[in-house]
């Protein structure tokens, strides 16, 4: 399975977008849309600190990293869960795993694989440290249980050269705008050839006269007229 469009946007709402390395709430160096070294390249420690000169370009780069990360976490959830999932359940689990990295050892996964969906939903709240994460965990629990997706706009936050987040929005994206960043525009189809211009009355009359003359000449040739 893959994240739905609403699942992708919900994840961006939870993570936010920071176009430079920053320290998260538990002092893990992070970049872009929740990317850490644990997810693979790039290592946030190797990136320049502070706000980039071109924010729009930096956001596009962060989105490219996000796409690679999402594919990894989707595969992890698909590998850990051995029962059929509804789309909203899968979206909630990927969001949970993207944040915790704990899908393979979580009680909620064991309960889900045992067929205890309600117990799995309850177990989301077993991962509620630090306190700042509780609202997100409740949103993931609600999504898993009821299919209720969060709403809002994905926010691009600033950061400084020390890796501190500056809580002043630099950009915001509606879901359609964020999804457009994830997917390049469709190539334009080749233009259709222009239709032939209709023949003018004068040209048509001249062609008809030439055809009549040719037919008449043929008649004289065959019949000696």
Label each region the model flagged.
Residues 43-44, 54, 142-146:
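Short, intrinsically disordered/low-complexity patches at protein termini
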Residues 45-82, 87-105, 109, 117:
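Alpha-helical segment that forms one wall of the substrate-binding/catalytic cleft
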Residues 11, 31, 89-97, 121-125:
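Short alpha-helical scaffolding segments that buttress acidic/His motifs in well-ordered protein cores
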Residues 23-48:
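Substrate-binding/active-site groove segments that recognize
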Residues 1-9, 14-20, 26, 37-38, ...:
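Long, amphipathic alpha-helical surface segments
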